[in-house]
Amino acid sequence: IEEENADVRLIGSGAILREAIKAREILKKYNITAEVWSATSFNLLRKNGMEVERKNHLSPDNDSELSYVEQCFSDNDIPVIAATDYMRSYSEQIRPYIKSPYHTLGTDGYGRSDSRETLRDFFEVDSTNISRSAIYALYKKNHFSKEQIIDFYKDLEVDANKPNPWEVWCQK
């Protein structure tokens, strides 16, 4: 879903694409415009990036080709949030090809949930946490004051004391 003058870009992969679309609606409440992108395969995007990189290295006289990801995200100032129902390392594969601030959300750890909704909240890949990550990325770029982000987080019911999902399995 393209958005002219987007403040942030959201990448959703698999079932989490729906959460990214919901996050876009949540962000509207805070006057934040978001583009939503679907990543059907971070593996293929990485391979394309490596292929283009190799081609450029082998042809220094013609080394200006860009990978598909670089073409899509050529504006280096717009934060990108990638969310997937795989481990974060899955979406981290394209980090070298994104020059913008890049934040990844994934299901690292051991989940113990009775529903998909609870599982996505547990791993922080639901629409609320995608929104939180987008708001934080914009805060780091000085789009919001500390007071504003605190108010946004209260409204989103962000629990700063929630344990890291990737460490919960070993806690007693």
Question: Model segments located where?
Answer:
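Thiamine diphosphate
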Residues: 1-172
